[in-house]
């Protein structure tokens, strides 16, 4: 959430940011109207309370002098009635202002390029060369079904479209990747945590998923939301709290749940876009002056997984029209998918500055008083999409899949997934 004082003093900066995000400026216009009315009511309320104090003293004086107080008491009743009306109006304006503030996105950083959509995202670097196949590569879903390690039919049978059952070496590969990613990030200095995946509304609001993305979330009947990403529970570990020692680096594996699988006809086959998927997350809490250096380091930490797996990828700097609601700056890591002949997102690494911390009230102490921390996070990585990249980039002509060398210790030394080695 932005600082209301900043919005009030620099409305044109916020309007410009909304325009660059391809958004209407109606929100800021409505906010400023309510803010003016709210402050006017605050002034009137203060004046009425001052007047009430004056009348109270006048009544006391009249009583002391045994004089008639009826007119002053009637005046006091009128003042009290108006104060109650004003207080109700103030509460209503304050609620409306808060609701609008929750819907205003973060202001992109000066190093976030201006653009309309993903086509305007500049490439920062390309790492690795896409493999040149001597045969026509198969998509991951065909490989998975042929090797009997991915069962889309059973997933649809027990849950519906957008769910998959991993079997045998498929399940082991998924688990191996989770363990591998967590161990790499632990060596990088992140503390592993294992948080709940049922999240309350306050926590979902703190990281910016609510209210804007409510329709993309799974809401349980008792009011809990299923975590769309580990970013939510991990960031909110410090909700309404002070962090006594910065920086704090955390990593977590969770299952994630989103309603968007196969939306608009995209990725309706395979496991690139699922309602339930696994992800390893990186989260940082840092001082404001270090947050952009820490974004570069966090991005490098996520990249290390791709480098160790020897998967070709690129890094793009998201433009203002593509960046997430809460982010000030984001790098996407995109892994090469041979059968699509393009790079696909496998991680987003973002600096939120104090946007999330202000919503979740996460602070640290300074000699000048409390300040909001800066929060950052990134996928390290999306596990299912890493499986996609391995199956497609490491496939062989005979239908088997080579296991990346770095994963073999996590799979009992197995070197391949084939119809002979499936369990």
Curated annotation (Swiss-Prot):
Q: A single GO CC term, please?
A: cytoplasm
Classification via InterPro entries: aa-tRNA-synt_IIb (IPR002314), aa-tRNA-synth_II (IPR006195), aa-tRNA-synth_II/BPL/LPL (IPR045864), Ser-tRNA-ligase_type_1 (IPR002317), Ser-tRNA-synth_1_N (IPR015866), SerRS_1_N_sf (IPR042103), SerRS_core (IPR033729), tRNA-bd_arm (IPR010978)
Q: Which residues form a coiled coil?
A: none
Q: Which residues bind ATP?
A: 258-260, 345-348
An example GO biological process term is: selenocysteine biosynthetic process
Q: Which domain of life is it from?
A: Archaea
According to its UniProt record, the EC number is 6.1.1.11
Q: Which reaction does it catalyse?
A: tRNA(Ser) + L-serine + ATP = L-seryl-tRNA(Ser) + AMP + diphosphate + H(+); tRNA(Sec) + L-serine + ATP = L-seryl-tRNA(Sec) + AMP + diphosphate + H(+)
Localization: Cytoplasm
For this UniProt record, the keywords arranged alphabetically read as follows:
Aminoacyl-tRNA synthetase, ATP-binding, Cytoplasm, Ligase, Nucleotide-binding, Protein biosynthesis
**Is the keyword Metal-binding in the record?**
no
Subunit architecture: Homodimer. The tRNA molecule binds across the dimer.
* Role summary: Catalyzes the attachment of serine to tRNA(Ser). Is also able to aminoacylate tRNA(Sec) with serine, to form the misacylated tRNA L-seryl-tRNA(Sec), which will be further converted into selenocysteinyl-tRNA(Sec).
Q: What is this protein called?
A: Serine--tRNA ligase
Q: What is the lineage of its organism?
A: Archaea, Methanobacteriati, Methanobacteriota, Stenosarchaea group, Methanomicrobia
């Amino acid at each position: 959430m932005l600082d209301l004082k900043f919005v009030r003093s620099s409305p044109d900066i916020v309007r410009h940011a909304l325009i660059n995000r391809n958004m209407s400026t109606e929100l800021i216009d409505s906010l400023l109207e309510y803010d003016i009315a709210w402050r006017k009511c605050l002034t009137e309320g203060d004046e009425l309370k001052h007047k009430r104090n004056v009348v109270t003293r006048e009544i006391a004086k009249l009583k002391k002098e045994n004089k008639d107080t009826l007119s002053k008491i009637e005046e006091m009743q009128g003042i009290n009635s108006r104060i109650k009306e004003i207080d109700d109006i103030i509460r209503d304006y304050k609620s409306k202002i808060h609701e609008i503030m929750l819907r205003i996105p973060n202001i992109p950083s000066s190093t976030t390029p201006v653009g309309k959509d993903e086509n305007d995202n500049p490439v920062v670097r390309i790492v690795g060369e896409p493999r040149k196949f001597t045969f026509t590569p198969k998509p991951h879903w065909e490989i998975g079904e042929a090797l009997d390690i991915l069962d889309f039919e059973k997933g649809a049978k027990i849950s519906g479209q957008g769910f998959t059952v991993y079997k045998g070496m498929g399940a082991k590969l998924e688990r191996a990747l989770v363990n591998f990613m967590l161990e790499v990030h632990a060596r990088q200095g992140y503390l592993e945590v294992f948080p709940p995946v049922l999240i309350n509304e306050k926590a979902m609001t703190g990281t910016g998923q609510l209210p804007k993305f409510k329709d993309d979330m799974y809401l349980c009947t008792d009011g809990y939301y299923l975590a769309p990403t580990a970013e939510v529970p991990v960031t909110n570990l410090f909700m309404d709290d002070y962090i006594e020692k910065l920086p704090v680096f955390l990593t977590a594996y969770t299952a994630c749940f989103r309603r968007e699988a196969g939306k608009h006809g995209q990725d309706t086959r395979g496991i690139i876009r699922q309602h339930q998927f696994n992800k390893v997350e990186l989260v940082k809490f840092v001082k404001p002056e270090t947050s952009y250096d820490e974004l570069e380091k966090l991005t490098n930490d996520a990249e290390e997984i791709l480098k160790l797996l020897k998967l070709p990828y690129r890094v793009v700097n998201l433009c203002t029209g593509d960046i997430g609601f809460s982010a000030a700056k984001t790098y996407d890591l995109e892994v090469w998918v041979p059968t699509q002949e393009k790079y696909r997102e496998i991680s987003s690494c973002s600096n939120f500055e104090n946007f999330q911390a202000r919503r979740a009230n996460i602070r640290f102490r300074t000699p000048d008083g409390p300040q909001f921390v800066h929060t950052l996070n990134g996928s390290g990585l999306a596990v299912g999409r890493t499986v996609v990249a391995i199956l497609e980039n490491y496939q062989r002509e005979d239908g088997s899949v080579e296991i990346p060398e770095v994963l073999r210790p996590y799979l009992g030394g197995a070197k391949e997934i084939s119809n002979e080695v499936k369990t």
